[in-house]
From Swiss-Prot:
It comes from Laticauda semifasciata. GO terms for biological process: arachidonate secretion; lipid catabolic process; phospholipid metabolic process. This is Basic phospholipase A2 GL1-1. Disulfide bonds join 38-98, 54-144, 56-72, 71-125, 78-118, 87-111, 105-116. PLA2 catalyzes the calcium-dependent hydrolysis of the 2-acyl groups in 3-sn-phosphoglycerides.
């Protein structure tokens, strides 16, 4: 084998080893994003909910800052219950549809049904809750105690 081929092979192997240490992204995040867009009829981009208040986004602590943030806390709690059932909510894929009346779930397994219900409830809650720009990207160390 040529030395250049060995270097390429070595580089591929090293990159694969490094990639195996990277945690996977939540698989149902895209589905949740579409449920949100369906529920709010596209009135606000889904990423606006990724860093809102004390609970929308990664983690969560303290008292929710408003109704929308309470939706995220309820969603977090729902995922916690799903985990107690032995489900992996961030990795669970499910079937859903966006109909004229909004999104709805159409899934087969208990975990799929439960996780889809969590996401559906949150998406509908987001759609009916006011969005306060002042609660986007807040200093959680000060406001979420």
């Amino acid at each position: 084998m040529y030395p250049a081929h060995l270097l390429v092979l070595l580089a591929v192997c090293v990159s694969l080893l490094g990639a195996s240490a990277i945690p996977p992204l939540p698989l149902n995040l895209v589905q949740f994003t579409y449920l949100i867009q369906c529920a709010n009829k596209g009135s606000r981009p889904s990423y606006h909910y990724a860093d809102y208040g004390c609970y929308c986004g990664a983690g969560g602590s303290g008292t929710p800052v408003d109704e929308l943030d309470r939706c995220c806390k309820i969603h977090d709690d729902c995922y916690g219950e799903a985990e107690k059932m032995g489900c992996y909510p961030k990795l669970t894929m499910y079937n859903y549809y966006c109909g004229t009346e909004g999104p709805y779930c159409n899934t087969k397994t208990d975990c799929q049904r439960y996780v889809c219900a969590c996401d559906l409830k949150a998406a509908k809650c987001f759609a009916r809750s006011p969005y306060n720009n002042k609660n986007y990207n807040i200093d959680t160390s000060k406001r979420c105690k």
